């Protein structure tokens, strides 16, 4: 078997695994070479105030596998306009995003290209919307990314969808159980 064929099989298996791990209530709303938009809707069995507070405790629910340092404990979000969603460790630091909107118990919005998107010079906005519903919270998370058509963002939409979808699930579990992983 040639290296190219093996690589193709492995890539296909990885994409299939990603598709299976994305929650059914997630959606890549649109994807083009210069933009994509993903959206998640989740019901959280806790009031909006608990969800809002937990968003600011990102080090407790974000997956360390999706950090530069390998440890989510190095993450923080300064919950104020202009606040940094930062990662700091002995070997370096990264500003992942910046807080651009806060509405207590209703919304959190940050601007920044997460992970490999940072190197592409994209404009990216991640929004958490919270609404009291049936004794809990209707949580809507959207990520809108725009850049140059040469960025090939359509190829990144599904993997980013998988990472953000997993993060939404971890946030939900953290709020409901105090533990981000099952």
Regions found by a protein language model. Name each.
Residues 115-162:
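Beta-strand/loop substructures that line and gate deep hydrophobic ligand-binding cavities in soluble
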Residues 2-13:
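Bacterial N-terminal signal peptides that target proteins for export
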Residues 17-25:
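C-terminal segment of classical bacterial N-terminal signal peptides
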Residues 24-74:
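Hydrophobic ligand-binding cavity/cleft-lining segments
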Residues 51-54, 85, 99, 110, ...:
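Hydrophobic pocket/interface hotspot
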Residues 173-182:
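Short, highly charged C-terminal tails/helix-capping segments
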Residues 60, 70-115, 177:
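Glycine-rich portal/gate segments that line the openings of hydrophobic small-molecule binding cavities
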